[in-house]
């Protein structure tokens, strides 16, 4: 069996913060290893890693028993990015970053790019510059004993921001490039699985509020998925797309099967989300080898939950990892770089040909002068005439025998030192004086505290929502417009169906300007 899991992790370092370990240096490796063990998959595909190569650490990338592959955003730090972790028993024969082929600079690429004539070179580079696609190619053995090729496309598709129309164009062009590459691989004889965050809820059953959304099925992303996927799951339908939504193949009518929830509104508590994460397999592969397709909503740590599938095939591991594997990166390769690689050879100027070990005549003159000064300084007697040896403890209690006297006070010898006794009256006086000072300090502190309390009254209590009569929460308008930056109050409960009394009510109140 081959088990695949895909998860939009929303920052690969975020879920690691809750894992405790005694050795900080190995904490990341232990945490990442525990996450992979918890997912219990032969191949784990992660999206939205939010790391760039300069901040990727060895404990995070090199996990015992796995070989990993990363694609980074080249334009922004802490943005996008995908990664694939393969068990050593599922080592790929090839791996490649990006969909266009422009990022392939070494052997071991997957190949099969298809016809991309309607894309410019600049557009292809832009589509691959955000670290949104990673391909690994594997050898699998079917239950019949036949060896075949399987290509996994780990994708994090763009989100179309309503306020940025150009991002919708970018998203649709990315979809187009993804489909061209996937179909080219199919035409070359490889089985193909597209898995990851597609950032589109395909059917109304895949979105909690589809009935209230205008022109839901007219969305360009949903139309693209209509053309990519076959209708009616595994059964024959009016449209026979090259791929099948594996989850809907096994659970065609399952409601509430969501994979993404809003963290701001707390919608996950009431399962008020959408299904954006998929495992799409080519039609022949799904029908012949898929045993199950599942969601893992109980796995926390991100605003998405993992999804996956189980195939009735076995993996045939490659003898060596592809060149894209992180173990071959110079910073993780385990070989020390020579310092000569960082030095630039240049022709020496004749002025500097003199050896540094042989000083010039002028330098020798200065050195002789400095030596003479040192000798004269050392031979000069001390002003005090005292020796620099270790002093006797008694010398601190006796007057100095040489040098000017700084004081006429005769210090007693060590044996005659006597500690005076403190009378009971003095002790009581000190206690009373201390209590008086403490009382005065307390009174002064109380006066100061009351003054600041009168000056700074603190925040006023939150208003109560109309539906539950519970304290509200304050939010800030972030949408561009006349109300940008204004504060308002709303119900503090999580978002949910309007018919659910435990979900958020529609209370809204503008905050008074300060």
From Swiss-Prot:
SUPFAM superfamilies in the cross-refs? DNase I-like
Q: Which residues bind Mg(2+) 1?
A: 8, 48, 303
Instruction: Note the site residues: Transition state stabilizer.
Output: 199
Specify which residues bind Mg(2+) 2 according to the UniProt entry for this protein: 197, 199, 304
Q: Which GO terms describe its molecular function?
A: DNA binding; DNA-(apurinic or apyrimidinic site) endonuclease activity; double-stranded DNA 3'-5' DNA exonuclease activity; endonuclease activity; phosphoric diester hydrolase activity; zinc ion binding
Active-site residue list = 156, 197 (proton donor/acceptor), 304 (proton acceptor)
Q: Which cysteines are joined by disulfide bonds?
A: none
User: Which residue positions does UniProt flag as site: Important for catalytic activity?
Assistant: 277
Q: Which InterPro entries match?
A: AP_endonuc_1 (IPR004808), AP_endonuclease_F1_BS (IPR020847), Endo/exonu/phosph_ase_sf (IPR036691), Endo/exonuclease/phosphatase (IPR005135), Znf_GRF (IPR010666)
Q: Which residues lie within the region annotated Required for the interaction and colocalization with PCNA in nuclear foci in presence of oxidative-induced DNA damaging agents? A: 390-397
Q: Which reaction does it catalyse?
A: Exonucleolytic cleavage in the 3'- to 5'-direction to yield nucleoside 5'-phosphates
The UniProt site entry described as Interaction with DNA substrate is assigned to 304
Could you say how this protein's activity is regulated?
A: 3'-5' exonuclease activity is activated by sodium and manganese. 3'-5' exonuclease and 3'-phosphodiesterase activities are stimulated in presence of PCNA.
| Gene3D superfamilies the record matches | Endonuclease/exonuclease/phosphatase (3.60.10.10)
* Alphabetical list of NCBIfam families matching this protein: xth (TIGR00633)
- The protein depicted here goes by the name DNA-(apurinic or apyrimidinic site) endonuclease 2
Name the species this protein comes from. Bos taurus
The root-end lineage is: Eukaryota, Metazoa, Chordata, Craniata, Vertebrata
